[in-house]
């Protein structure tokens, strides 16, 4: 069974392990989430829980949103996400999910929206190599060949310049270094996707490396 929680990325810092090792960590503020809905194989074809995170002003919500959260006896939520294959039987609608669901040493996957980089060329966007910069070369940072002559067109999927970033990215197999239950904080080893204050979803790892 998978467990998960929604939170906001605060930023990065570093902590010391007991053996003196310096560990870079990302701080995630995961205030209590509320279970808004339970989905089961019988009713929906799969098992999942729907979590709501951060209160939203009622003025900014529509009637369906208000009715949906009212069933869980809570206020409208700004962010709503599903955690698939969760422990449906162990949770009830309206119940709070806190950082205590995780413990130090657990391995998790963290999903977020990557930082937007704007319009970028193929070298930065796709990691292509540049051409010679001197000796009469006129090919420096271009995308290269557009493909064979015969099709008379450029195939879909050709790696070209374009808008970079702003994509959903999941970093797998990150270790939880510390869980601060008093301040609702998770300290995760390494970096996670997204800018500061952006939404992240922390879930139990799907592919735990042995």
Curated annotation (Swiss-Prot):
Residues 125-151 are annotated as: Disordered. InterPro entries: Ribosomal_uL3, Ribosomal_uL3_bac/org-type, Ribosomal_uL3_CS, Transl_B-barrel_sf. GO terms for cellular component: cytosolic large ribosomal subunit. GO terms for biological process: translation. Keywords: Ribonucleoprotein, Ribosomal protein, RNA-binding, rRNA-binding. One of the primary rRNA binding proteins, it binds directly near the 3'-end of the 23S rRNA, where it nucleates assembly of the 50S subunit. PANTHER family: 50S RIBOSOMAL PROTEIN L3, LARGE RIBOSOMAL SUBUNIT PROTEIN UL3C. Belongs to the universal ribosomal protein uL3 family. This is Large ribosomal subunit protein uL3. It comes from Bacillus mycoides (strain KBAB4).
